[in-house]
Curated annotation (Swiss-Prot):
Coiled-coil parts of chain: none
Keyword vocabulary terms for this entry: Chloroplast, Membrane, Photosynthesis, Plastid, Repeat, Thylakoid, TPR repeat
Membrane topology label: Peripheral membrane protein
Single biological process term from Gene Ontology: photosystem I assembly
Matches recorded under SUPFAM superfamilies: TPR-like (SSF48452)
First and last residues of every TPR repeat: 35-68, 72-105, 120-153
Protein name (record): Photosystem I assembly protein Ycf3
Function: Essential for the assembly of the photosystem I (PSI) complex. May act as a chaperone-like factor to guide the assembly of the PSI subunits.
Source organism (scientific name): Zea mays (Maize)
Subcellular location: Plastid, Chloroplast thylakoid membrane
Taxonomic lineage from the root: Eukaryota, Viridiplantae, Streptophyta, Embryophyta, Tracheophyta
An annotated GO cellular component: chloroplast thylakoid membrane
């Protein structure tokens, strides 16, 4: 039984019902429908913290999905799971792959910046200020890209960029 049919909470049930209706009314191939079903089940598993199950569903969705835009969101979600698991190198790889297919994902740029900023903080704790500055500079570049795509968002990042004099805003 697909995961979407066994969820108990109202939001998950509502999402599943809407997704199933969309699958029926939008003209798509059976492969696209199967890919979306795996993607949807991956999102539900991810929202419940079942990351191994979510990854299995996302990998299957990737195998079936041919649209680069849709694949970008699958890759982004895989990156989120690796971020949650502390696997930052893998997460960065998946965010990069998502952005190759869809360069208009500000949330991917933001998450990459957060990882770089975290690595900069870790370098400071290890006493390596030169490496820390390189990580912070990289974080700044990613945040600038995220902010350029969605100027009203990422206020904390904008403040950090101003405070550290890495970016001037009008």
């Amino acid at each position: 039984m697909p995961r979407s049919r066994i969820n108990g909470n109202f939001i998950d049930k509502t999402f599943s019902i809407v997704a199933n209706i969309l699958l029926q009314i939008i003209p798509t191939t059976s492969g696209e429908k199967r890919a979306f079903t795996y993607y949807r089940d991956g999102m539900l598993a991810q929202s419940e913290g079942n990351y191994a199950e979510a990854l299995q569903n996302y990998y299957e969705a990737m195998r079936l999905e041919i649209d680069p835009y849709d694949r970008s969101y699958i890759l982004y979600n895989i990156g989120l799971i690796h971020t949650s698991n502390g696997e930052h190198t893998k997460a960065l790889e998946y965010y990069f792959r998502a952005l190759e297919r869809n360069p208009f994902l500000p949330q991917a740029f933001n998450n990459m910046a957060v990882i770089c900023h975290y690595r900069g903080e870790q370098a400071i704790l290890q006493g390596d200020s030169e490496i820390a500055e390189a990580w912070f500079d990289q974080a700044a570049e990613y945040w600038k890209q995220a902010i350029a795509l969605t100027p009203g968002n990422y206020i904390e990042a904008q403040n950090w960029l101003k405070i550290t004099k890495r970016f001037e805003f009008e």
